[in-house]
Curated annotation (Swiss-Prot):
L-aspartate binds at residues 86, 169, 223. The keyword Transferase applies. This is Aspartate carbamoyltransferase catalytic subunit. Heterododecamer (2C3:3R2) of six catalytic PyrB chains organized as two trimers (C3), and six regulatory PyrI chains organized as three dimers (R2). Belongs to the aspartate/ornithine carbamoyltransferase superfamily. ATCase family.
Length: 311
């Protein structure tokens, strides 16, 4: 049995069964990355076209590596060298490229809703690699994979997300995903970084970081999204780090088996101290590693795969 949806647009488009299928498939995919030859012919003859309208390191490279590990051809379109610089719309660009018969489109865009718009107008699967402040489903899935891998479960755990919640698509997707899989979530941030309508998220909210940390099984730190804010939302960076940053001293109040996560890029010394980011509780690099496995699973499943692709 495959996914119940053609497109991966947000966590709302995935059922609990879909999420479990992705995570189970990703575990099989991770084994491929541990082999001496990290490649299988599963998607040979398939083509992935990627559009990244925002800067990206981990996500862009991860999708590219994922496609190539499954033997798919991966083509990344540079906006700067495309006809969009001549006035062509994104929709026209994609519809023209669709006639070249790609098998899946991956898109990151600064405007919320763009992947949904494309999905309505093209006949191939669309994977959202992040749209504005709205959603980042593959990030939430890799985060859930990492927690499940380290804790053996997601259900019943407590996730604390600390930082710029208002402007974070990662926060929104993780809240929805973890709640759907039976975890509880607490959001901690200054009032200027809590979104309007947060009461609809289904998560607890506090402005006290130490309170959020104390009961958490998993702590996810978020950077300040300066590129999405009209002005800095705290008095000074130093004051923000002192009040909301995760330090070794603050971590003493956490559970002894707590996991520390960060979607990256990390601003060391601001939202998280270097010794915490590099410390024994950190699974930040595990998240990066699992990102490849999750995106391999997504490519495989949206192209019609049912489960095991390890051969």
């Amino acid at each position: 049995m495959g996914l119940s949806t053609r497109d991966i647009l947000d966590m709302g488009s995935l059922s609990r069964k879909d999420i479990s299928l992705v995570l189970d498939t990703a575990r099989s995919m991770k084994e491929i990355s541990l082999r001496p030859v990290k490649k299988v012919p599963t998607l040979r003859g398939k083509t992935v076209v990627s559009f990244f309208y925002e800067p990206s390191t981990r996500t862009k490279v991860s999708f590219d590596v994922a496609a190539k590990r499954l033997s798919a051809d991966s083509i990344s379109l540079s906006v700067a060298t495309s006809s969009m610089t001549k006035g062509e719309t994104l929709l026209d660009t994609v519809k023209n490229l669709e006639r070249m018969s790609p098998d899946v489109v991956v898109i990151r865009h600064s405007s919320a809703g763009v992947p949904h718009m494309l999905a309505r107008h093209v006949s191939v699967p669309v994977i959202n690699a992040g749209d504005g402040m709205h959603a980042h489903p593959s990030q939430a899935l890799l985060d859930m994979m990492t927690v499940q891998e380290k804790k053996g479960r997601i259900e019943g755990l407590r996730l604390a997300i600390i930082g710029d919640i208002a402007r974070s698509r990662v926060a929104r997707s993780n809240v929805e995903g973890f709640l759907k899989m039976g975890a509880s979530v607490v959001l901690a941030a200054p009032p200027t970084m809590i979104p309007v309508g947060v009461e609809t998220f289904g998560a607890d909210v506090t402005h006290n970081v130490d309170e959020a940390i104390a009961g958490a099984d998993v702590i996810m730190m978020l950077r300040i999204q300066k590129e999405r804010a009209a002005a800095f939302l705290f008095s000074t960076v130093r004051e923000y780090a002192r009040t909301y940053g995760l330090t070794a001293n603050r971590l003493k109040n956490a559970k002894k088996d707590v996991l520390i996560m960060h979607p990256g890029p990390v601003n060391r010394g601001v939202e998280i101290a270097p010794e915490v980011a590099d410390g024994p509780y950190s699974v930040i690099l595990d998240q990066v590693e699992n990102g490849v496995a999750v995106r391999m699973a997504l490519f495989y499943l949206v192209m019609g795969g049912q489960r095991d692709a390890g051969d």
